[in-house]
Amino acid sequence: MPVITLPDGSQRHYDHPVSPMDVALDIGPGLAKATIAGRVNGELVDASDLIENDATLSIITAKDEEGLEIIRHSCAHLLGHAIKQLWPHTKMAIGPVVDNGFYYDVDLDRTLTQEDVEALEKRMHELAEKNYDVIKKKVSWHEARETFVKRGESYKVSILDENIAHDDKPGLYHHEEYVDMCRGPHVPNMRFCHHFKLMKTAGAYWRGDSNNKMLQRIYGTAWADKKALNAYLQRLEEAAKRDHRKIGKQLDLYHMQEEAPGMVFWHNDGWTIFRELEVFVRSKLKEYQYQEVKGPFMMDRVLWEKTGHWDNYKDAMFTTSSENREYCIKPMNCPGHVQIFNQGLKSYRDLPLRMAEFGSCHRNEPSGALHGLMRVRGFTQDDAHIFCTEEQIRDEVNACIRMVYDMYSTFGFEKIVVKLSTRPDKRIGSDEMWDRAEADLAVALEENNIPFEYQLGEGAFYGPKIEFTLYDCLDRAWQCGTVQLDFSLPSRLSASYVGEDNERKVPVMIHRAILGSMERFIGILTEEFAGFFPTWLAPVQVVVMNITDSQSEYVNELTQKLQNAGIRVKADLRNEKIGFKIREHTLRRVPYMLVCGDKEVEAGKVAVRTRRGKDLGSLDVNDVIEKLQQEIRSRSLQQLEE
């Protein structure tokens, strides 16, 4: 009979099989009331599942990450319960958990309206408030199939026929009259599923195949308590205000259009931000001793066959042909950089060779995945490749890591999660080579006092990598930086150098990106700053305004002086009230507004206001210029007097 070992090491002995709920009741009624599921010998199980042999057991509650995931999964079943009550002929497909919530794909003979979604959510609340028990039954494959055939659930039957072995025992979860099929676990009672909201609907093909029927996907979010739900909804509201697509339109930064899906039309102000970002990156390339190069936009398909991209990546590549030759528009820059490396004989004395490019790349992303600047088809990478010896890997990775943190800190990103991906089962190279490479990456991170977690087996077949994920002010994750070792591509493209022993050797290649896609990073910055770009990045840094026509000449002189000082400035001499002008330029997020009235003209000064509404008073013109230059030169995140 089972001996149950709890997380604190204590043991409980039973003379009969017990469930996690039985053990929780044995410990105390409070824990039993909070029990959602159990973890038995490391495996998640339902609270009602029986433990027949000695085992370790952890009780899962809503405070656990797994508990919240189970709540979300059960809310998907609750959605199924509600939709079948409102529209009984609906056919249910799949209802998994996703980030922050869940969805259910349904086959319904009507297009769901916003009113339908509201009615569905209302019915879900009515059902959840009944606090009914969720009953799990393990049945034979044949019984499960018969159940869903009788209910007309053709998608469930398809899952059984194609995805579940005939000797398996599927779990059927009974929500009163509604039955769903799942591996589980699920909540034991619907009292855990009170805090949810349906978010949106979308189209989705059955099994993700465009040859299949288009279903309706209903998305929802669910949380353990009302406070967490409200906090999430507030974050979404704030994110909507910061949406780079909305701000990009307000500030006239860029646009996209149907004739060029996933391609950016940069307007003057957006392109100003892009170019300033390039200037910043170039300053770091110089500091960290990189060469800057430029490769062609397209190369013969034969080259992409040599690299392996054609076999593994051709669906994402745009192609064209000329004079009976097929060309690929480059989806990445590395093969071109190897071609540059291959020009001329290289010696070990030439290494490390650090090669950087603002590489214009194109990838044939699915149209449904395109999203403003965040997911595009045409983009520019702040890409670099370092050619080095095995002995130089650690020092080069060390420098890459310092560069990553140096650049991210300029934008105020402080929370950065780092992951080290190790060797997969299918790989090239010896175990000794992988041992050394993984150790070099780990030691480089440790030497920089950077905590990291391993992603075992998640490296590429050609080498391990470090991924840097930054978190923005809304605590959203953005995977931007990568340091990837590559033991394959240089060999495939016949790259070599002459070693100290006068023998030809293949260099190690380090792929290094920090911002990732320039377009995407500008999207991230737009949302991070809500369009209030730091002064050094702002398209227009200063607007000079008159109050009446008598100050026009002074405004023009001051504007010219600011331009000569390297400041991006505009004069606003319109015959409008000064309050109107200030409001308009505040909405345009211009960092500084300089107001010139008769007093300022007489004293040779200027009244300074910030876009946050702070009045800095009447200041000497030369002092203002000097302070602005210092703020811009230092790439400060703060404005004057902050």
From Swiss-Prot:
E.C. designation(s): 6.1.1.3
Domain (TGS): residue spans on this chain: 1-61
GO molecular function: ATP binding; metal ion binding; threonine-tRNA ligase activity; tRNA binding
Example GO biological process: threonyl-tRNA aminoacylation
Enzyme class at the top of the EC tree: ligase
Keywords: Aminoacyl-tRNA synthetase, ATP-binding, Cytoplasm, Ligase, Metal-binding, Nucleotide-binding, Protein biosynthesis, RNA-binding, tRNA-binding, Zinc
Catalytic activity: tRNA(Thr) + L-threonine + ATP = L-threonyl-tRNA(Thr) + AMP + diphosphate + H(+)
Cofactor requirement: Zn(2+)
Location in the cell: Cytoplasm
Cofactor binding summary note: Binds 1 zinc ion per subunit.
Gene Ontology terms: cellular component: cytosol
Sequence positions that bind Zn(2+): 334, 385, 511
Residue span of region Catalytic: 243-534
The keyword Nucleotide-binding is annotated on this UniProt entry: yes
CDD domains named among the record's database cross-references: TGS_ThrRS, ThrRS_anticodon, ThrRS_core
HAMAP family reported for this sequence: Thr_tRNA_synth
Family the entry assigns: Belongs to the class-II aminoacyl-tRNA synthetase family.
Function: Catalyzes the attachment of threonine to tRNA(Thr) in a two-step reaction: L-threonine is first activated by ATP to form Thr-AMP and then transferred to the acceptor end of tRNA(Thr). Also edits incorrectly charged L-seryl-tRNA(Thr).
Subunit text: Homodimer.
Protein name (database record): Threonine--tRNA ligase
This protein's encoding gene: thrS
